[in-house]
């Protein structure tokens, strides 16, 4: 598998990249915007993604978030990222994810090496992320 590297102009507050999600029962695919969140435990999808892919609810689970405890729907789907990362997994539904369709948490990030760096070259700042799975134990391939 190849590493996934994305460069952003300037300083970034939100790491948002393209991804694809797929219904495991129908092979229906959807291109989405993915928000990477190292503070999140699990991958989450918006209600819109669940509806567009016609995902079947497999259960409900209680989660704890900054807004308190709540019960959310559980689904299974396939996640495809640039560089060849593909994983069938349990996802949780959240009513809305600001600026993105899915939230990638540590359950995905933990499958590989994830590096975020901010560089300044010729007085121009640029941010980069690097994701490689399986992990190669690389400390900074972007240096």
Question: What residues fall within each predicted segment?
Answer:
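Pepsin/retropepsin-fold aspartyl endopeptidases
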Residues: 1-143
């Amino acid at each position: 598998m190849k590493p996934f590297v994305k460069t952003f102009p300037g300083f970034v507050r939100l790491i948002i990249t393209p991804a694809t999600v797929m219904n495991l029962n129908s092979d229906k695919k959807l291109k989405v915007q993915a928000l990477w969140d190292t503070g999140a435990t699990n991958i989450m999808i918006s209600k819109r993604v669940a509806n567009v892919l016609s995902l079947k609810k497999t259960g409900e689970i209680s989660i704890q978030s900054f807004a308190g405890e709540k019960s959310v729907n559980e689904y299974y789907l396939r996640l495809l990222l640039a560089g060849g990362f593909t994983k069938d997994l349990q996802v949780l539904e959240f009513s809305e994810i600001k600026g993105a369709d899915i939230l990638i948490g540590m359950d995905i990030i933990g499958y590989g090496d994830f590096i975020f760096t901010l560089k300044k070259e010729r007085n121009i700042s640029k941010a980069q992320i690097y994701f490689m799975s399986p992990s190669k134990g690389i400390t900074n391939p972007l240096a």
